[in-house]
Structure formats: structure tokens, C-alpha cells
Amino acid sequence: MKEQEIIAELSHSYFNHILREVRPFLEYFNDDFLDSSLTAPIDSELLERLFFMAAITSLDVSLPFNFSDSDVVKSHRKHRWLTSVQSFGSKSKQGIVGKSRLFNAFTVVVKRAKNSKFDEITMRDFCVGINLNKILRQAPFFVRTLGGFQHKNQFNIVTEFVDGRTLKTFLQSKRSSWMDFLNIFFQILLGLEIAQNRLNFSHYDLHTDNIILVPVERSFTVSLYGSNYTVKHDYRPVMIDFGLSSVHTKGKTLGQTNLENKGIFGHMSPGYDIYVFLLFCIDVVQSTNLSIYKGITDLLGFFNSKTNISMDLLTNNHIQSLEKGVSNLVPYQFISYIRDKFSPYLNVDIGPQKMSIDRCLGQKPMFLRLKHLLDRDDELEPLNSPLLKKGFVKTLVNNIKVYYWYREKMVLESDQTAQLIETDKEILDNLIDDLELKIVRKGSDKPQITVEQKNLFFMALEYYNFIRELRLEESSEFYKTWSKRFKKTWVCRNIFSQLDCVIREERLTKCPTAGATLEK
């Protein structure tokens, strides 16, 4: 498929998903709502839905890529909800960037291409952004793309406004420390690892103007591969501008193929961002902040230790370095390297992932958040039919969520409970069998954990944490015995000593041959 066809298909899937969520509330999105003052707390995820409702119900704008919305009543114009466009940010060769007011309450960023020559960059920026939105709860290190619209035959992207300073400004300050930079970079690695694992994401333009540092007042936790990383640093980095980026989702790979001679491909290159980013930083600090410059040089030792490429080549020829093995390194390997070499300088608490009640409950359902904001007369009722998940544990977690959020008690009959527990026994016993397998590959004399076993382990770990949080070990001999068996499996005892290698193996199998992804 051609890239524009991929973008249209992925965008239509996104629009249909959002439309299903907001359709019950479209009749409430009227002049009275637009005239009211939005005083309730509105996070960026909810704002994304409100933006979509504004765009799809406007007379003078349309959703891009010929999305069919003929059954939606249109009743207002863009100036009612998007106003005061002002120039903003550094000048760009490709596009025009401005700040606007959304619903006269929120500052947002509006971007459009300078001319049709750069339309594909703007469209890719949008499509990569809406897919990154899917992981922002797990990885709050990317700007949220609120949506896009067509106005006067021009495509516009709208993103949240990230209120902070650029990493470039931070690096140019002599008051900035190496320890601060290390903590910022460590968070970037967490974000890139999650994005690569979930979406085969590569940014490909991660320079110091494309990272905004947001001041944070309280710690936050990122979960990754069975560990919790509680970040206590003063800044959270947010990555922006995805016009050169690549993602893979729904069986489609999105990315450009015009810059392969610079090491930038139409698909993921695992080591590109983590390496080239440090080179961008060196260019900024080498004459302004010698402490950070020396620290970054020390960090480049990671690539030297993994590839035996000389430091001279690493700092002076990034194309050759990428080709000689740097592109095949993954962010998680760098995370492990920093934990091993620089942990005293990290303002991050690292411990085993636990399944708390809050984590079980998840975030308040979008239906209830929209209802609270729009259905002021409390007319709409949620459609909550009983849902039996696959097995007793998952069903119990689901029923707890339903009761907590909707105050609706889901009662299981005794025969249903027995049947669901039998399903769990089959699932969980099969997991134990798979995690006890010792697979010795050709040419090796030691067993190695496979990619499939790694994935099954984290599935089993989720069950284990749910069982402990729900205290099922106290009421069921089966769950008590299974938990003990799980902790003793060969994979459970060896997973973290082999995790770097398994993740790297898995990541490299996701990288197609350069140039074979897209049809131009």
C-alpha cells in the first residue's frame, strides 16, 4: 500500500473508535455547551474527545481523508471553538505552527504544512501521534495529538500545548547538571522502550528542540517488564513532532523512505533514536556545559561496550556506527546499562511491579467522564451487560471495576463460578507447563528463554499479581498452589538475567528489510 492509503486507513479506524465513544453525547454538544465555561477538570484524553466532537459537528471544517460523517448533525462553525491563532515556536521549513484557544479555555498548538510539498510530513505527524495516544497512560513522555481537520482545503493538526522549556534551553544553561540530564535521558529511554515494544516506534528526529521539559510536583510511576519505576525528578520530558517517525499497528507499517542514506527508514530502527539523540546533545553542550558533555561521552560508552565500535567513530560518523551494529541495540539494554553503571545518580525508585487496587480499577470510564461533563440532566444510562471474562480471575477483576465505577453488582451463580475456575485451571496449568520448558538452541549448550516464553511469563505474572491482590490464595487451594509453582518455574527464576537478550531478539525480528515496507 502507498503511505497515504495507510494513513487514511489508520485514521479512519481512529475516527470510528472515537465516534463510537462520543456518539451518545453529540446531541448535548450544542450552543449551550459552547457558551458555558468549562470549569471541571479536563485532562488531555477527555479534551481529545471534545475536540473530535467540535470538528465533526462543524459546518465549515471536515475530518480529513474523506471520512464519512453524513449522519452527524452539523450546527456551528470553527470560530466558536477554536480562536486566536498566534505564531509560535521556532521557524520551520516544512510547516506553520501557531497557538490557539480551544473552547476559550485551553491553549493548544495548531500545525499545517506550508504548501502541498510538505503535506505528507504533516499527515504522518498526525497519524503517528494518534497511535502514540494509545500508550500515554503507560508512557507519559509524548505529546497528545488532539485531532486534525480540513479547513479551506488545508489539513491542520491540533496537539496539546506542552508548557515547559526545550531541552536545548536546558542544556545551554550553565546551571544545569549532569545528574539532571541523566534523569531526563533515563525517562526518554523508558518512553522509547514502551513505544518500540507496543508500536515499533522510531522518532527519527529526536533533537533538543523536539523535547519539552515539563516541571512536575509529584512523583509518578512507569511500569515496564515486571518493574515499577517511580520517577522523582523535577522534570518530565515530552517528545513532540512526529513528521519523520515510524509506527507499526493493525498490520500496517507507516514511515517514509526518502532518507535511507541518512540511516532513517520507513520502519523501526531500534538503536537510532537513543544514539543520534546523544549526538544532538553533544553538539549543544560541547562549548557551554563541560560537565554534561563529559557525562554524555561516558554514556556513549554503552555503544562501545556492546559493539566494540571505537569512540572516535561513534562521535564522528553516525552512519557507519549505525551500520556496524548501533542500530540493532534497544532502549531497554541502555536502561539496564544505566541501572548498572549510574544508579546512584538516578532519582528513580525501582522495585517489583505490584497490582494495587487502583491499578485493578484503572481510569474512570470515558462514558462516565463525558456524561459528567455533557449530560447535565442525567438522562443517559450506561449499557452495562454482564460480561464473563475468560476465567474466574479476569471476571472477578471486571466485576469489581463495574461495581466501583457504575455501582452495579454483578452476581455469579455457583455453577458459573465453578466453570470459570475450571477455565482458569486450564489456562494457568498450561502456563506452568510452558514456563518449565528448557529450550537449548542449536550451537548452544545452555537453555535460553524464547520470545514466546517471555510473553507468557508476563501474562502469568499479571495473573499472579491479581491473585495476590484479590487474596485468592487465602480462599482457594488451587490458586495458592499455582502461585507457589509459578515462582519456582525455570523461566521465572531466569527471566531477568536473560531479558536484555530476549527483548533484543524480539525487537530485531520486527524490523523488515529497509525499503520493503512502503510502495511509493
UniProtKB/Swiss-Prot annotation:
UniProt cross-references to InterPro entries, sorted A to Z: Kinase-like_dom_sf, Prot_kinase_dom
Sequence positions that bind ATP: F88, G89, S90, K91, S92, K93, Q94, G95, I96, K111
Protein family according to the UniProt entry: Belongs to the protein kinase superfamily.
GO molecular function: ATP binding; histone H3T3 kinase activity
Domain of life: Viruses
Catalytic residues of the enzyme: D205 (proton acceptor)
Stored Pfam families: Haspin_kinase (PF12330)
Keywords, alphabetical: ATP-binding, Coiled coil, Kinase, Nucleotide-binding, Transferase
Enzyme Commission identifier(s): 2.7.-.-
PROSITE patterns: PROTEIN_KINASE_DOM
Protein name: Probable kinase 098L
Enzyme category, top tier: transferase
Coiled-coil ranges from the UniProt annotation: 416-442
Keyword Membrane annotated: no
Protein function: Probable kinase.
GO terms for biological process, alphabetical: intracellular signal transduction
Species lineage: Viruses, Varidnaviria, Bamfordvirae, Nucleocytoviricota, Megaviricetes
Every Protein kinase domain range: 82-393
